[in-house]
């Protein structure tokens, strides 16, 4: 866990990552808050706060007496949201810096391709 960020956010993000990567497909049950709490050694209320964040975002749904399940369309919604965040956090600053340095879009694309090959 990352000490600099709230644990409940990290729990929600891990479930989101598992959904995006296909480890938790739509309709599948996610671990219970008690399972999260035991595995991560955190207070069950902290785990519940992370899961409730996913419920509030419509990513998982509660099924009374059964558990929490990934909703239909959750993966697509998460990818759409992450793409928008990616553009805001990374692409816009990258483009601004490239313009300052006189790097045009074609050169920038070439730099990105070269970097991708190296990684």
Model-identified regions with their sequence ranges:
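Extreme N-terminal segment that seeds HTH/winged-HTH DNA-binding domains in transcriptional regulators
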Residues: 1-29, 35, 85-119
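Short glycine-rich loop/turn motifs that provide flexible caps or phosphate-binding loops at active sites
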Residues: 21, 26, 49, 64-66
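Short, Lys/Arg-rich nucleic-acid/phosphate-binding segment
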Residues: 29-30, 62-75
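Short secondary-structure transition/capping segments
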Residues: 40, 74-75, 118-119
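Generic hydrophobic secondary-structure packing signal
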Residues: 43-46, 83, 94
């Amino acid at each position: 866990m990352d000490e600099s960020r709230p644990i409940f956010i990290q729990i929600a993000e891990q479930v989101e990552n598992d959904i995006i990567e296909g480890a938790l497909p739509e309709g599948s049950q996610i671990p219970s808050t008690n399972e999260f709490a035991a595995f991560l050694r955190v207070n069950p209320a902290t785990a519940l706060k992370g899961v409730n964040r996913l419920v509030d975002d419509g990513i998982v749904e509660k099924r009374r007496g059964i558990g929490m399940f990934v909703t239909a369309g959750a993966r697509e919604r998460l990818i759409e949201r992450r793409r928008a965040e990616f553009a805001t956090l990374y692409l816009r600053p990258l483009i601004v810096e490239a313009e300052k340095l006189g790097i045009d879009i074609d050169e920038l694309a070439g730099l990105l391709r070269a970097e991708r090959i190296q990684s």
